[in-house]
């Protein structure tokens, strides 16, 4: 079982997120990470960074089994934008932290936003989805062991098969990014 170092755990506990209104405009208010007290018309911002190789395969990662939510599921890199952090800067940071890849200046960029609403749960969020094309192989990937239990370069059909098994996070919301 992998353990996060104390510094990383403290950093996560101290993380702050901007609060947005239903039109994705900042309210000027900030919340603590995972402090699910958002009203039904308030949101925080998350990002996903999909990495595609020129051969059409996508870099997907497998969540560690110690995750409280969706352990062992496949996903693409992503996470919450921190307070004061622009969406693009957040996706650059998340991809770098989780995979070791620098997508700044890579072909591609922002594709679309979707909204996830969980009435009464205090956890509503926008997801900005990005896709970047990079000519990479195994030697380029340096994944974050505290969060990721492995990775693969998958075809669209392989990703769809994981989704059909019910083990690919957010597939229905992001499937058009794999086209």
Annotated model-derived regions:
Residues 46-78:
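A glycine-rich, hydrophobic loop/mini-helix early in the fold
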Residues 12, 71-72, 83, 110-117, ...:
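Nudix hydrolase/Nudix homology domain
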Residues 23, 53-56, 64, 133-138, ...:
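Short loop segments at secondary-structure junctions
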Residues 13-48, 54:
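Acidic, metal-coordinating catalytic segment for phosphate/diphosphate chemistry
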Residues 1-6:
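Short, small-residue-biased leader/transition segments that mark boundaries at the very start
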Residues 35-38, 67-70, 151:
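A short local loop/turn or secondary-structure capping micro-motif enriched for an aromatic residue
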Residues 59-60, 76-109:
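The catalytic Nudix box helix
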């Amino acid at each position: 079982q992998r353990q996060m170092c104390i510094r990383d755990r403290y950093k996560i506990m101290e993380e702050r997120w901007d609060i947005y209104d239903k039109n994705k405009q900042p309210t000027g208010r900030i919340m603590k990470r995972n402090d699910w007290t958002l009203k039904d018309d308030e949101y925080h911002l998350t990002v996903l960074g999909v990495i595609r190789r020129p051969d059409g395969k996508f870099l997907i990662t497998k969540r560690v089994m110690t995750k409280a939510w969706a352990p062992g599921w496949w996903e693409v890199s992503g996470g919450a934008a921190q307070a004061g952090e622009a969406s693009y800067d957040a996706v650059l940071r998340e991809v770098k932290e989780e995979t070791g890849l620098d997508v700044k200046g890579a072909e591609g960029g922002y594709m679309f936003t979707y909204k996830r609403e969980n009435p009464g749960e205090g956890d509503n969020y926008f997801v900005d989805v990005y896709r970047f094309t990079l000519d990479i192989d195994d030697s380029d990937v340096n994944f974050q062991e505290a969060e990721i239990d492995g990775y693969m370069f998958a075809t669209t059909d392989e990703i769809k098969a994981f989704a059909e098994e019910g083990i690919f996070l957010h597939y229905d919301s992001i499937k058009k990014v794999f086209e």
